[in-house]
């Protein structure tokens, strides 16, 4: 009898631009989830799902630097659940991937320097490394349950469906605001002309 809702963030500038496109009677452009200051990559893999990737690069033969974590992955939990186990290896094996790591992360930037076992990264592709370092998460856009203009719960298939449904309401608000500003300026004009 309950419901779950998850509406990802979208770029306010893209929302504004799409509202302007609707006002001009143009079709809105597709929007991807967006997070301020996120420098990773967001790719739509289906209409209901986007993949969010952090950033890492090779800084030497056995060294990598992580400069961005996926959205909603916190630095402390990342160290505990990903980096520390990579240093210890699995419980039933002597294998380990990391020799050491340094955490140069601060409040505004992510910066992990990873030192791998000699030749561990040799012949490893980007997909393997991304999976090893758990640098990808997914964002689902199929749980957007919101109140519609009539006040009933409605499941929206996309952010553009939400935008289109509320476009008429927004347009009326723009018209009311314009009328208010015109009447205010006209009243000021009358005061000054006396």
Question: Whereabouts are the PLM-identified features?
Answer:
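Phosphate-handling active-site elements
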Residues: 11-22
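Conserved phosphate/anionic-ligand binding catalytic regions in large, soluble enzymes, centered on
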Residues: 1-13
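Charged, surface-exposed alpha-helical interface/stalk elements
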Residues: 20, 24-194
């Amino acid at each position: 009898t309950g419901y779950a809702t998850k509406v990802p963030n979208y770029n306010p500038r893209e929302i504004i631009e799409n509202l302007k496109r609707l006002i001009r009677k143009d079709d809105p452009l597709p929007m991807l989830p967006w997070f301020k200051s996120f420098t990773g990559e967001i790719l739509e893999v289906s209409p209901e799902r986007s993949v969010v990737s952090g950033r890492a690069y090779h800084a030497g033969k056995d060294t990598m630097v992580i400069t961005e974590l996926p959205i909603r992955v916190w630095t402390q939990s990342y160290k505990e659940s990903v980096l520390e186990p990579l240093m210890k290896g699995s419980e039933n094996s002597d294998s380990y991937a990391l020799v050491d790591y340094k955490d140069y992360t601060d409040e505004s930037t992510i910066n992990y320097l990873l030192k791998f076992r000699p030749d561990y990264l040799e012949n490893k592709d980007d997909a393997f490394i991304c999976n090893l370092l758990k640098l990808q998460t997914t964002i689902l856009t199929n749980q957007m349950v919101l109140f519609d203009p009539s006040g009933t719960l409605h499941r929206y298939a996309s952010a553009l469906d939400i935008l289109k449904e509320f476009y008429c309401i927004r347009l009326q608000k723009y018209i009311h605001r314009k009328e208010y500003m015109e009447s205010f300026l006209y009243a000021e004009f009358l005061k000054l002309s006396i």
